[in-house]
């Protein structure tokens, strides 16, 4: 789509109103060329629990309803393929607000500096202390339970993780 940047906000408004009906929200909107056609990809997550497993029927129904709504959208005159999909179980946590929503979730976090001899930690994000502006994560290191406090500014990268 040559004009994707100019119509992305309008597509987002249309999609948001439809996705709310299915308790979904937009995680990311992408446009790329694949299989010899333009693809409009809308990655979604649950509104209340960002890392909750999504109902396949909700994704299909929202895709169909969104397809109908975009059919007469003037900015999409060229042929394209619509893909509404889950953002994924190990999706990146991109902001402080998203990290706050991840409290009580199992996450992977990479810090700018080592804490307890490690800069990469996988564990349960226990808490966000508003007064101290710090997060607390609990994890196991060599069989021992550890807790570490960190500020969002110390985070190099964070994502949801799967505990095995």
From Swiss-Prot:
Summary of the function given for this chain in its UniProt record: Required for maturation of 30S ribosomal subunits.
Cross-referenced SUPFAM superfamilies: YhbC-like, C-terminal domain (SSF74942), YhbC-like, N-terminal domain (SSF75420)
Native source species: Mesoplasma florum (strain ATCC 33453 / NBRC 100688 / NCTC 11704 / L1)
InterPro entries noted in UniProt: Ribosome_maturation_RimP, RimP_C, RimP_C_sf, RimP_N, RimP_N_sf
GO biological process, one term: translation
Signal peptide segment: none
Protein's gene: rimP
CDD domains: YlxS_C
Keywords carried by this UniProt record: Cytoplasm, Ribosome biogenesis
Family that this chain belongs to: Belongs to the RimP family.
Protein name per UniProt: Ribosome maturation factor RimP
PANTHER family (UniProt xref): RIBOSOME MATURATION FACTOR RIMP
Domain of life: Bacteria
GO CC field: cytosol
Alphabetical list of Pfam families matching this protein: RimP_N (PF02576)
HAMAP family membership: RimP
Cell compartment(s), UniProt: Cytoplasm
């Amino acid at each position: 789509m040559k004009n994707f940047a100019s119509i992305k906000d309008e597509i987002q408004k249309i999609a948001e109103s439809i996705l709310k009906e299915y308790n979904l929200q937009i995680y990311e909107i992408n446009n790329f060329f694949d299989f010899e056609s333009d693809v409009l990809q809308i990655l979604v997550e649950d509104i209340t629990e960002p890392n909750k497993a999504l109902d396949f029927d909700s994704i299909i129904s929202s895709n169909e309803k969104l397809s109908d709504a975009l059919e007469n959208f003037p900015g999409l005159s060229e042929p394209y393929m619509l893909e509404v999909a889950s953002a994924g179980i190990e999706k990146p946590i991109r902001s402080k607000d998203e990290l706050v929503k991840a409290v009580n979730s199992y996450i992977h976090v990479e810090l700018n500096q080592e804490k307890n001899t490690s800069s990469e930690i996988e564990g349960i994000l226990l808490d966000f202390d508003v007064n101290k502006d710090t997060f607390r994560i609990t994890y196991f290191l060599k069989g021992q339970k550890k807790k570490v406090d960190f500020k969002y500014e110390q985070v190099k990268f964070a994502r949801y993780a799967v505990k095995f």
